[in-house]
Amino acid sequence: MPSLAVIGHLSRDVVAGAAPRIGGGSWHATRALVALGADAVIVAACGTDDEDAFRAALAETGVPFELHAHGATTAFSFSYDAVGTRTMTVDAIAEPFAPEVEADWVQVAPLLRGDVVVPRAPHVLLDGQGLVRRPALGPLQLDADFDAELLRGVSILKLSDEEAAVIGPVDVPELVVTHGMRGATVNGTHIAADPVDADPTGAGDMFAAAYLAARAAGAEPVEAGRSASAVVSALLSDKLSQGRTRP
């Protein structure tokens, strides 16, 4: 049994009008897991039309995985401005996914509210976009209309600045807020990041995976945050990816 699992839908992403590409938190997390050599498994879902291509892409990473295909693939189109602010549109929505996993540390990487059932595990990291992103087609909408029961059993909540502003105060054992190019805050302690001029897509997912891997290895929260920040900066600048199979 691997010590760490990442679960969530894969997505079909169109960035700045380019050709569609594989995306989603469970995909971007593999980049950090490969760089760290983590003992991990990916448990992902996609639509039947994308199954063959997405299965091949996951296989190339070298990370053990399960891929469940049914219905449609969640799809997004988005772009970034000069300071990294993202404009995003929901083009298609997949059916909810309820995976079974056996791991002590689980990263739950939803794309929209309600699209992944949070499993029971000793340590669960939940990405806050699964709380605030409305499952509706069109321009991405955020609100705080989520069931607070979703946080029951969550050990670590990872939010972006925008998500944190929507949710407001929250009571969880560990709170991680990412600030894009400005680093992150872990339980109130700010962690700086080395600025990198690169496509930031998936940086939050990589941070979450690296953070959880560090916690699983025994690091305390702030130490894990510093480790994750360094990993993401290195990955975005390609310093950890050279010579390795990666997404």
Go through the PLM ranges and name each one.
Residues 2-6, 11-20, 34-115, 119-123:
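Conserved N-terminal subdomain of the carbohydrate kinase-like
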Residues 22-25, 139-145, 192-193:
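Charged helix-capping and loop-helix junction motifs
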Residues 24-35:
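Histidine-anchored nucleotide/phosphate-binding helix
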Residues 33, 160, 204:
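Short, conserved phosphate/pyrophosphate- and ester-handling motifs at nucleotide-, phospho-/glycolipid
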Residues 60-66, 88-89, 103-106, 121-126, ...:
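Active-site regions of enzymes building and remodeling cell-envelope glycoconjugates
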Residues 76-77, 133-139, 186-188, 198-205:
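Short, charged, surface-exposed secondary-structure boundary motifs
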Residues 105-170, 181-183:
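Conserved beta-alpha-beta core of the PfkB/ribokinase-like small-molecule kinase fold
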Residues 174, 194-247:
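Conserved post-catalytic alpha-helical subdomain immediately downstream of the catalytic base
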